[in-house]
């Protein structure tokens, strides 16, 4: 039996001539049930099966699903004829060395200010690994200098065309732009009210790209993603675990599907099969991993210790949201937590991460002038000013929501990191700890405080987090606290 495999572009492909039974088998093999489907009305009403699929009954699938598909076709006795519509690119690079940017100097606010920019051994290894595999993901721990790695890759791609770097939030756009400018790269940004075109490298958020395409479709502007991607040979996604958002998958497998060089960096590859496959479909397979523990052993990251404070609460709620509302708004708990945070801050700058704005406001109200609350509504520049102040201050308390500060923000001089009810998301917990373990001139150790409860759902979530701490090799101990 024969089947034709049509490679439409870098990520999308289609099989023609497969028997119905084979298509059903493949569709079932590449179909995953989404755990959150139980809460979606369409699933409850029986209008949706609660699954996400990577092979359609029409034969459409993704190039990075072929390692799963081809062995099944082989078993079924199919011969595969290939029709390749991809644009051909001859990509060759010299091996990168530590001296790539040695003619540039570190900026004033860097621990090595004024010294030449020399890449570390592990950064050179990561960069060369990417150059050998033009479509791949690497799991690189927070604090490894991912922005410098991204800049080196953008620089290496200049010979072939433009690069687009997609980051998860506005703070990271400006942070990445500053590093690119310091390294002498021709860079522009696309987000909010700054829309710069015609630069060799463009840094943007996935939200701004999504809005661009929507406005183009609605006839509100003359350019869309296809025009934006002209002459682009490389798309990089920083903190790629955010790429499981459907929007980003749609971007990378839609308007950006002809871009040949596709790289993803993240501190945390998601655990769930469907989330991981969504990333692999968009960018490529995971080829390398560099853990925070390895970087701690090398002396690049600060050592840490997780102190779990399990507050004893004799309350019972039917669902997690109601329980969380109690745990983050109860006045006795907030009084106890603010007193605890005040004591911690005497030992150095403290970053407190909370799930809800109301909890953050409740804590800052009690902590008074010594604390500042940072949420998504604060302007990006004002947030940056607060983060920068930490490099000078000694007993500053920053209270922030997980969404704002848990990803990619560079605040090295944090001596205490407080996680209030961090939940059970592997990505959130590990990325949040990444905020604390960056090294500074006067810091090689950080205390992490996991404030949780003995209440039903909180207790379950702690069981999950203990697994994460063990896997990441972060030492932890649990103390039960009767705070009332």
Give the location of each predicted region:
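A conserved SF2-helicase RecA2
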Residues: 278-307, 313-315, 427-433, 437-484
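Walker A/P-loop
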Residues: 118, 132-157
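Conserved interdomain hinge at the start of the Helicase C-terminal
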Residues: 153-154, 316-355, 361-366
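Conserved pre-motif I regulatory segment
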Residues: 39, 45-55, 81-139
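Post-DEXD/H (motif II) to motif III coupling segment of the RecA-like Helicase ATP-binding lobe
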Residues: 69, 233-234, 239-305, 469
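Conserved helicase ATPase core of P-loop NTP-dependent helicases/translocases
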Residues: 174, 186-198, 351, 361-362, ...
């Amino acid at each position: 039996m024969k089947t034709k495999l049509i490679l439409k572009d870098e990520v999308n492909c289609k099989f023609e001539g497969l028997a119905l039974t084979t298509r059903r088998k493949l569709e079932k093999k590449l179909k995953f049930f989404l755990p959150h489907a139980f809460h979606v009305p369409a699933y409850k009403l029986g209008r949706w099966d609660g699954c996400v699929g990577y092979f359609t009954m029409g034969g459409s699938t993704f190039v990075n699903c072929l390692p799963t598909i081809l062995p099944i076709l082989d078993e079924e006795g199919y011969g595969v004829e290939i029709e390749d519509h991809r644009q051909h690119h001859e990509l060759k690079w010299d091996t990168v060395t530590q001296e790539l940017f040695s003619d540039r100097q570190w900026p004033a606010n860097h621990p090595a200010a004024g010294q030449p920019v020399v890449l570390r051994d592990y950064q050179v290894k990561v960069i060369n690994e990417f150059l050998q595999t033009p479509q791949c993901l690497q799991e690189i721990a927070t604090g490894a200098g991912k922005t410098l790695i991204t800049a080196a890759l953008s620089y290496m791609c200049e010979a072939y065309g433009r690069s687009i770097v997609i980051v998860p939030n506005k703070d990271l756009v400006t942070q990445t732009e500053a590093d690119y400018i310091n390294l002498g790269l021709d860079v522009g940004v696309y987000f909010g009210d700054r829309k710069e075109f015609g630069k060799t490298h463009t840094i943007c958020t996935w939200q701004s790209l999504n809005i661009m395409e929507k406005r183009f479709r609605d006839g509100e502007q003359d350019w869309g993603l296809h025009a934006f991607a002209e002459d682009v040979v490389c798309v990089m996604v920083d903190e790629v675990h955010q790429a499981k958002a459907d929007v980003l998958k749609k971007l990378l497998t839609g308007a950006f599907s002809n871009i040949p060089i596709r790289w993803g960096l993240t501190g945390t590859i998601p655990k769930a099969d469907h989330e991981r496959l969504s990333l692999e479909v968009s960018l490529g397979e995971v080829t390398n991993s560099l853990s925070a523990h390895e970087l701690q052993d090398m002396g690049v990251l600060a050592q840490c210790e997780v102190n779990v404070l399990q507050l004893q609460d004799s309350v019972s709620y039917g669902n997690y949201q109601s329980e969380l509302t109690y745990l983050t708004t109860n006045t006795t708990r907030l009084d106890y937590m603010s007193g605890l945070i005040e004591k911690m801050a005497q030992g150095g700058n403290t970053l407190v991460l909370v799930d809800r704005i109301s909890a953050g406001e409740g804590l800052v109200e009690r902590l008074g002038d010594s604390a500042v609350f940072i949420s998504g509504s604060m302007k990006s520049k004002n947030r940056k000013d607060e983060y920068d102040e930490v490099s000078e201050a000694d007993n500053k308390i920053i209270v922030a929501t997980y969404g704002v500060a848990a990803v990619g923000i560079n605040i090295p001089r944090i001596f205490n990191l407080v996680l209030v009810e961090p939940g059970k998301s592997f990505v959130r917990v590990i990325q949040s700890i990444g905020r604390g373990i960056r090294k500074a001139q006067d810091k090689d150790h950080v205390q992490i405080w996991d404030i949780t409860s003995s209440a039903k759902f909180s207790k379950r979530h702690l069981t999950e987090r203990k697994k994460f701490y063990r896997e990441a090799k972060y030492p932890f101990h649990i103390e039960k606290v009767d705070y009332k």
